């Protein structure tokens, strides 16, 4: 049985979701998700994309970020996207379904990118949220660790990693560790994130 507290929380989220200006705008523009606008904001502030870039999108479904990236890099660019969930085809994006934290899927990623000069790895992925920080924080940090580990193998010199995390216990320590591994790293908090959201994005340059 679903608790009344959880039911009320879900109903409140649904109400906020459908009233959200970015959800409405995404529907109007036929954009796959409101996260498109987060990436647009981060890109405008940091100039992430250039025509002809090669991009890896981890945790890509439903495809908002891949959709935005494909528009920015043009026909000469390349995007490889991966998610455990299915994703409808996007022109200019190669997609395969699988868990990138799984060794078999990771090997497929590495094989597909073996001859690619990869400029950007991006991940808007989050674990299934429990609402319990002591569970959610280790899970999101583990995802971040995997993304950064993948970057060690495939990211070109001066390449960039953009990955979602949460503010909470353990993040500051993890961020300090990453400072030692990249020439530049900073935290981005898009205005397009929901006001109550703890999500932040790490932007790191090799």
From Swiss-Prot:
<comment type="similarity">
    <text>Belongs to the class I-like SAM-binding methyltransferase superfamily. RNA methyltransferase RlmE family.</text>
</comment>
<keyword id="KW-0963">Cytoplasm</keyword>
<comment type="function">
    <text>Specifically methylates the uridine in position 2552 of 23S rRNA at the 2'-O position of the ribose in the fully assembled 50S ribosomal subunit.</text>
</comment>
<keyword id="KW-0489">Methyltransferase</keyword>
<dbReference type="InterPro" id="IPR050082">
    <property type="entry name" value="RNA_methyltr_RlmE"/>
</dbReference>
<dbReference type="Pfam" id="PF01728">
    <property type="entry name" value="FtsJ"/>
</dbReference>
<keyword id="KW-0698">rRNA processing</keyword>
<protein>
    <recommendedName>
        <fullName>Ribosomal RNA large subunit methyltransferase E</fullName>
        <ecNumber>2.1.1.166</ecNumber>
    </recommendedName>
</protein>
<dbReference type="GO" id="GO:0008650">
    <property type="term" value="F:rRNA (uridine-2'-O-)-methyltransferase activity"/>
</dbReference>
<dbReference type="InterPro" id="IPR029063">
    <property type="entry name" value="SAM-dependent_MTases_sf"/>
</dbReference>
<feature type="binding site">
    <location>
        <position position="65"/>
    </location>
    <ligand>
        <name>S-adenosyl-L-methionine</name>
    </ligand>
</feature>
<dbReference type="InterPro" id="IPR015507">
    <property type="entry name" value="rRNA-MeTfrase_E"/>
</dbReference>
<feature type="binding site">
    <location>
        <position position="99"/>
    </location>
    <ligand>
        <name>S-adenosyl-L-methionine</name>
    </ligand>
</feature>
<dbReference type="InterPro" id="IPR002877">
    <property type="entry name" value="RNA_MeTrfase_FtsJ_dom"/>
</dbReference>
<feature type="binding site">
    <location>
        <position position="83"/>
    </location>
    <ligand>
        <name>S-adenosyl-L-methionine</name>
    </ligand>
</feature>
<keyword id="KW-0949">S-adenosyl-L-methionine</keyword>
<dbReference type="GO" id="GO:0005737">
    <property type="term" value="C:cytoplasm"/>
</dbReference>
<feature type="active site" description="Proton acceptor">
    <location>
        <position position="164"/>
    </location>
</feature>
<feature type="binding site">
    <location>
        <position position="124"/>
    </location>
    <ligand>
        <name>S-adenosyl-L-methionine</name>
    </ligand>
</feature>
<feature type="binding site">
    <location>
        <position position="63"/>
    </location>
    <ligand>
        <name>S-adenosyl-L-methionine</name>
    </ligand>
</feature>
<keyword id="KW-0808">Transferase</keyword>
